[in-house]
Amino acid sequence: MEDSEGTDGTEEDGCRAGGWFHVEAIITHGQRQVSSDEDEDCTETGEDVDFIDNRVPGDGQEIPLQLYTQQIAQDDEATVQALKRKFVASPLSACSCIENDLSPRLDAISLNRKSEKAKRRLFETEPPDSGYGNTQMVVGTPEEVTGDENSEGGRPVEDKEEERQGGDGEADLTVQTPQSGTDAAGSVLTLLRSSNLKATLLSKFKELFGVGYYELVRQFKSSKTACADWVVCAFGVYYAVAEGIKQLIQPHTQYAHIQVLTCSWGMVVFMLLRYNCAKNRDTVSKNMSMLLNIPEKHMLIEPPKLRSTPAALYWYKTAMGNGSEVYGETPEWIVRQTLVGHSMEDEQFRLSVMVQFAYDHDIVEESVLAFEYAQLADVDANAAAFLNSNCQAKYVKDAVTMCRHYKRAERAQMSMSQWITFRGNKVLEEGDWKPIVKFLRHQGVEFVSFLAAFKLFLKGVPKKNCIVFYGPADTGKSYFCMSLLQFLGGAVISYANSSSHFWLQPLSDSKIGLLDDATPQCWSYIDTYLRNLLDGNPVSIDRKHKTLLQLKCPPLMITTNINPLEEDRWKYLRSRLTLFTFNNPFPFASPGEPLYPINNANWKCFFQRSWSRLDLNSPEEQDDNGNTSEPFRCVPGDVARTL
């Protein structure tokens, strides 16, 4: 157990400060003494311990482990400093990093830093420095793009070059970049090229044709909007395809105006097309991409300006030159704005023509008239003048007002027989009178008694001017009355509006009226205020913004779930009402299909069948006394002049 351990060494080997040395404990096994070279002596009493270390570092007395740790720490610190010097940017270059590496939008939100350099690229495509000298680049650095010379560090930018296929200097063409690592940079560059593509095509178009593309077209924001006329400009078309498109496009179009030019990208085909049917932008894009064999993003597709004289003159003038090929009939919007004859025919807007249009089409709503008349601008000169006017709202309001006046006067001078004939002439279908008779029999109503009451009702005989249809719910009371009201063009009044002074105003513009679903409160109101209305005598009706109107109340139909003849509180209404009871549920042949259909055609046939029984004037008598249904004309006719 007491074998001698350790390594023999001289004192000179252990005292050299510049090299490695061995310090070992020398133990005398007999006396168990520790060598004086050892730092700690457990047998010492502590009286001669020196608490202040006055040793000079590096005198050769350090512990080897501590020295080794210091050397490792120094090496790590040197390595970290080298990395920081290489990768960490200084405060002076922080602005350049943000401009080149990040989006300009991120730099725009900074409050302290203002950059004066022009920003044309969002990402720097330079790969990370490998540390082995300069790296040859294929894409220009941001210093080259912005036009600034490399003034930081005093080193010029070397070995940087850019290769493009088209020579136009834009980002839409293919850019060859070295395989420097990630796919993210490549996808971002593809996105940038796509965003700049349209601007590049517009610039090239103006350079080739000498006119802006949007000066000839109007923009459709939606690609689903259909139009028959389209302006297409395709870039990068092969020569053989550009020559063959003149024949390939003919089966799809009625008119084509084609121009073909040559540029550094290839052939450019510029076309004005009128398709056989209306198409949207997506359909046109797919069609032209298939015919021209080019990507859809290499085309500009918009509809032409239809009311622009300069645009029409451009198409007219270029069609006369030898640089264009045209086939088909020239569109009317070009002819209208270019030919002398059509220019002389342009006239100012005439309100009477618009009023006649509203009268002929029975339009009494301003919004409907404005929409319908504006659609005639391509075929009607007065409608085109209406669209060119700055007073469209005033014209529409005046035309509807005049149409209502004419309609009201025409209705007032017609008798009930003439009015039924007038309304029946508007129905072109052939109907059957039997469903009406069968429905009345289904409800237990005698047809003869109904005809007798209906004859007095149409004549407006006093005390017989109101018919009440009484019965439980879902028996067809409203269905029967509404169908008759629609055929005769009547008006509906509602007790819900009885708080207004003008709730009876619709009766002044109709030949027949309907009060649907009268409640006990409604019958009490009628018994209090509207007895003369049920009599058929002249009454005074208040109208909004107008003076009181005195007129004879038109025949009035009332539907109700309450029998007013059985209530003693309404005993004064019994002599003024003619009551018919509907007790049976409304019959259906199938869900949603009535067993006895009652429509305008059936009512027309019913009146024709029972014309004599209702004691209506025959059409022959009307012709003898003068036909009051002569078409109204507020526009003077054209005089035919012989040559």
UniProtKB/Swiss-Prot annotation:
GO terms for cellular component: host cell nucleus. Its main location: host cell. Residues 445-595 form the SF3 helicase domain. GO terms for biological process: DNA replication. Phosphorylated. Sumoylated. It is an enzyme of class 5 (isomerase). Keywords: ATP-binding, DNA replication, DNA-binding, Early protein, Helicase, Host nucleus, Hydrolase, Isomerase, Isopeptide bond, Nucleotide-binding, Phosphoprotein, Ubl conjugation. Disulfide bonds: none annotated. The keyword ATP-binding applies. Can form hexamers. Interacts with E2 protein; this interaction increases E1 DNA binding specificity. Interacts with host DNA polymerase subunit POLA2. Interacts with host single stranded DNA-binding protein RPA1. Interacts with host TOP1; this interaction stimulates the enzymatic activity of TOP1. This is Replication protein E1.
